[in-house]
Amino acid sequence: MQRPKVDDDLTLATDFGKTEAFVVEVLDNPATEEGVLLKVMTRGPFEQGQQVWIVDRDGSKVGANVENVSEQTIDNEVTLSTVLPA
């Protein structure tokens, strides 16, 4: 999986099914050497600490942790932390 860019579409697999998201910000995660923080806009009942999967176009999955959820009208701004494979 390549490092996402702003405005990329992502598919997230969660406890409540699959949902679409789009990337609004990509940052290096200072807590982990190769970690990435992704701020995405998406819909669904996300909670801090929740585990989700980012599903790549080829069907491969990368685990991510919900770091923060900020409700914005219908959509939520969700911050995900992950380590992308090289």
PLM features: residue spans?
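Beta-strand/loop-dominated core regions that host nucleotide or nucleotide-derived cofactor-binding catalytic loops
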Residues: 1-86
